[in-house]
UniProtKB/Swiss-Prot annotation:
It catalyses: L-glutamyl-tRNA(Gln) + L-glutamine + ATP + H2O = L-glutaminyl-tRNA(Gln) + L-glutamate + ADP + phosphate + H(+); L-aspartyl-tRNA(Asn) + L-glutamine + ATP + H2O = L-asparaginyl-tRNA(Asn) + L-glutamate + ADP + phosphate + 2 H(+). The lineage of its organism: Bacteria, Bacillati, Cyanobacteriota, Cyanophyceae, Synechococcales. The keyword Nucleotide-binding applies. It comes from Prochlorococcus marinus (strain SARG / CCMP1375 / SS120). Keywords: ATP-binding, Ligase, Nucleotide-binding, Protein biosynthesis. This is Aspartyl/glutamyl-tRNA(Asn/Gln) amidotransferase subunit C. PANTHER family: GLUTAMYL-TRNA(GLN) AMIDOTRANSFERASE SUBUNIT C, MITOCHONDRIAL (PTHR15004:SF0). It is an enzyme of class 6 (ligase). GO terms for biological process: glutaminyl-tRNAGln biosynthesis via transamidation; regulation of translational fidelity; translation. InterPro entries: Asp/Glu-ADT_sf_sub_c, GatC.
Amino acid sequence: MTRISSDDVRKVSKLARLEISEEHVETYANQLEEILEYIAQLEKIDTKNIPPTTRAVEVVNVLREDIVDKSNVRDKILDLAPNREGQFYRVPKILAE
């Protein structure tokens, strides 16, 4: 069994930039140990005759032919803008020059 120390939890939380209070460090250490035990069980499973897959159910794209259609959606959307300039949205400046 892999033992996760409190120092390990602190190190991982620092690398992940997560703030963990001292009162939760031991809890997370125990939870990480349980996760690693579960992974160790999964590693023991014989998967030699199981083909690799990316999903449990095969997904098939249903393709359709593109149809060009005239629309005035752009104007309708622009009419909803609180502030616009011609055919463009006008947004507040967020970056300094």
